[in-house]
Curated annotation (Swiss-Prot):
GO cellular component terms, A-Z: actin cytoskeleton; centrosome; cytosol; dendrite; growth cone; midbody; perikaryon; postsynapse
Domain of life: Eukaryota
Tissue: Brain.
Name the record gives this protein: Dihydropyrimidinase-related protein 1
Required for interaction with FLNA, short sequence motif: residues: 246-247
Keyword rRNA-binding: no
BP terms from Gene Ontology: negative regulation of neuron projection development; nervous system development; nucleobase-containing compound metabolic process; regulation of postsynapse assembly; semaphorin-plexin signaling pathway
Residues carrying Phosphotyrosine: Y504
Function as written in the Swiss-Prot or TrEMBL entry: Necessary for signaling by class 3 semaphorins and subsequent remodeling of the cytoskeleton. Plays a role in axon guidance. During the axon guidance process, acts downstream of SEMA3A to promote FLNA dissociation from F-actin which results in the rearrangement of the actin cytoskeleton and the collapse of the growth cone. Involved in invasive growth and cell migration. May participate in cytokinesis.
NCBIfam families: D-hydantoinase
UniProt subcellular location: Cytoplasm; Cytoplasm, Cytoskeleton, Microtubule organizing center, Centrosome; Cytoplasm, Cytoskeleton, Spindle; Cell projection, Growth cone
Compositionally biased residues, Low complexity: 513-525
Organism, scientific name: Homo sapiens (Human)
InterPro entries in alphabetical order: Amidohydro-rel, Hydantoinase/dihydroPyrase, Metal-dep_hydrolase_composite, Metal_Hydrolase, Metallo-dep_Hydrolases_sf
Length: 572
């Protein structure tokens, strides 16, 4: 039974707002102008605007006015081993708004073999009744079963879902084979969907986990040791290769290592439509914490793919983000409490995976990229909002300050200092992986659907005020190029006459012959090796020989063989 939408849950009442004296920052331009908001939309942009009386005025005083952030990688209320992630849709979206994010795309994670449609309705209802900001939903394909194609069609055509995640890891749980990935990519391309990939080599991870546990390593460091970055990079390369054969766009989630990022950057230079998403954690911290003597601290960083133990990785990923080789920043927000993480205290494979970042994402990106001079303000807007809106077909409704766009607006103070700490964050967990980090850049005012939801450090939201935002298939930012490439690079056979020559008759035998028994499998039937020591054999060249009485001819040197000399290159 499908969820019919929330009942008697009041949406926020839009205010008439005038933002004066701000500097509008979009991904492609900046300008000084006032912005008038009404009925949840941006109505006017310019100077000396004529607005109705009684309008609330916000003085920006030259500060940046940017589109609200879009976090396309969250796992609120995700189930794991009978537990649920600590932040539900209320707590998670509340934290998002405080950090300047005004829309999320959350992952629906069905139990393997269960209905995608049923799971979607379950997530939709939970988000609709609790979310404080606008949201949409990815649907993860956790198994490739009979009937999945029909459900995917319904989700795309009737439910407003245009993005699906597949897994190359989690052997015997979520993992798909290469042939299944090929089938899924082909089918999803036909639907005009965005294909998200969790890229890790699940087969090798399973072997490494077994080996490391047998060595007696059970702590969080085992998580990183069993998932070296080569296994992420190999899977990224494989996913891009499969997508390239089909000519479909592919979006790599949670880029955590230099190797994986390099493969994405190189592939983009060669032409495949691939997009890479580092998360706040991989940009703001590293995997050296897995070796902390404090088990709870080490476990807090457990996520997959793991954070790189190389402390230079965050700076490297930030540089690739700044130059466009990586395009979007997510958070991968899926925190579990310390008590929940402790389920794996004696076995690192049982530690629930996930870190925080939904509140910290935009501040971390500003501090690591813009405040260091790697990235300008326009690029900041692109990687935190606009690129995501374009890829997932939300643009220009989201991701832009323009007349007609949704009134999701942030007044950003680039000079504001903020120390990240679990004592003041809005997440329900008692730790923060960015604990003690002092960052430049933070929102002063956050406006969602035309109403002020965060101002002067105070959050003012209600459960259920967020809206589900449906997304249409075939986002132009991706599929415009796909359509052209289908025409230009389509496969064509060679026009030739029919072959009418002889055809060898192949005997009707089984395709695969039974292999001969080996020494290991049938030692009793195997003959002893021949004797190579001539002293132990009855073979001799001394004494009388059987042909001693035959007449012998004098040897002659053959100048040319019978029939004359041959030419090895001649067939005549």
């Amino acid at each position: 039974m499908s969820y019919q939408g929330k009942k008697s849950i009041p949406h926020i009442t839009s205010d008439r707002l005038l933002i004066k004296g701000g500097r509008i920052i979009n991904d492609d331009q900046s300008l000084y102008a006032d912005v008038y908001l009404e009925d949840g939309l941006i109505k006017q942009i310019g100077e000396n605007l004529i607005v109705p009386g009684g309008v609330k005025t916000i003085e920006a005083n030259g500060r940046m006015v940017i589109p609200g952030g879009i976090d396309v990688n969250t796992y609120l209320q995700k189930p794991s081993q009978g537990m649920t992630a600590a932040d539900d849709f209320f707590q998670g979206t509340r934290a998002a708004l405080v950090g300047g994010t005004t829309m999320i795309i959350d992952h629906v994670v069905p139990e393997p073999g269960s209905s995608l449609l049923t799971s979607f309705e379950k997530w939709h209802e939970a988000a609709d009744t609790k979310s404080c900001c606008d949201y949409s939903l990815h649907v993860d394909i956790t198994s490739w079963y009979d009937g999945v194609r029909e459900e995917l069609e319904v989700l795309v055509q009737d439910k407003g879902v245009n993005s699906f995640q597949v897994y190359m890891a989690y052997k015997d749980v979520y993992q798909m084979s290469d042939s299944q990935l090929y089938e899924a990519f082909t089918f999803l391309k036909g639907l005009g969907a965005v294909i998200l990939v969790h890229a890790e080599n699940g087969d090798l991870i399973a072997q490494e986990q077994k080996r490391i546990l047998e060595m007696g390593i059970t702590g969080p460091e085992g998580h990183a040791l069993s998932r070296p970055e080569e296994l992420e990079a190999e899977a990224v390369f494989r996913a891009i290769t499969i997508a390239g054969r089909i000519n479909c766009p592919v979006y790599i989630t949670k880029v955590m290592s230099k190797s994986a990022a390099d493969i994405i950057a190189l592939a983009r230079k060669k032409g495949p439509l691939v997009f890479g998403e580092p998360i706040a954690a991989s940009l703001g911290t590293d995997g050296t914490h897995y070796w902390s003597k404090n088990w709870a601290k080490a476990a807090a960083f457990v996520t997959s793919p793991p954070l790189s133990p190389d402390p230079t990785t965050p700076d490297y990923l930030t540089s690739l983000l700044a130059c466009g080789d990586l395009q979007v920043t997510g958070s991968g927000h899926c925190p579990y409490s310390t008590a929940q993480k402790a389920v794996g205290k004696d076995n690192f494979t049982l530690i629930p995976e996930g870190v925080n970042g939904i509140e910290e994402r935009m501040t971390v990106v500003w501090d690591k990229a813009v405040a260091t001079g790697k990235m300008d303000e326009n690029q900041f807007v692109a990687v935190t909002s606009t690129n995501a809106a374009k890829i997932f077909n939300l643009y220009p409704r989201k991701g832009r300050i323009a007349v007609g766009s949704d009134a999701d607006v942030v007044i950003w103070d680039p000079d504001k200092l903020k120390t990240i700490t679990a004592k003041s964050h809005k997440s329900a967990v008692e730790y923060n992986i960015f604990e003690g980090m002092e960052c430049h850049g933070s929102p002063l005012v956050v406006i969602s659907q035309g109403k002020i939801v965060f101002e002067d450090g105070n959050i003012n939201v209600n459960k259920g005020m967020g809206r589900f935002i449906p997304r249409k298939a075939f986002p132009e930012h991706l599929y415009q190029r796909v359509k052209i490439r289908n025409k230009v690079f389509g496969l064509q056979g060679v026009s030739r006459g029919m072959y009418d020559g002889p055809v060898y008759e192949v005997p009707a035998t089984p395709k695969y012959a039974t292999p001969a028994p080996s020494a290991k499998s049938s030692p009793s039937k195997h003959q002893p090796p021949p004797i190579r020591n001539l002293h132990q054999s009855n073979f001799s060249l001394s004494g009388a020989q059987i042909d001693d009485n035959n007449p012998r001819r004098t040897g002659h040197r053959i100048v040319a063989p019978p029939g004359g000399r041959s030419n090895i290159t001649s067939l005549g």
